[in-house]
Amino acid sequence: SGPDIVTHHTCLYPMAGQTISASRAVEVFMAAGVPAEKLVLGAAFYGRGWSGLDSSRHPVGQTGKPGVSFRYPACAKAIAEGSQKRCWDDEAKAPYLWDGDTFVGYDDPESLYHKVSFVVSRDLAGIMFWEWSQDEDNELLTAIYETYQGHRFPR
């Protein structure tokens, strides 16, 4: 998929017909001999997306105009104000915003729960994120911390 093809930004698992995902990257590195304790999974504290999409079709897989970017607080605000609808892709374990024209993939507390659980279950070194300043209320950092509670940290 090229830069104009709509796909999830940082999905944990691939959707049907897709091959790119965080879990797949971990599998590839481990198959190449990289030890789990050397791998860190990534998360995004911002959203990335496309505009100019067809509202009659599911957004993922469409061709659109890339370049849409939201800080995490803007994602939450758009949902609260009703200008964007939060959707959940249960296969990819990824949220996205969708208004019929614009798709924005991002991470939220629910997707981070699944990512941290994956990190713990695979004994990975941990999780990283970009960019902390885009989590103004520490909602995402708190979700990561709270999910780790009760789990031991990898070596």
Regions found by a protein language model. Give the residues of each.
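Active-site rim elements
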Residues: 13-16, 100-107, 128-129
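Stable alpha-helical elements in mature extracytoplasmic
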Residues: 18-26, 108, 112-115, 140, ...
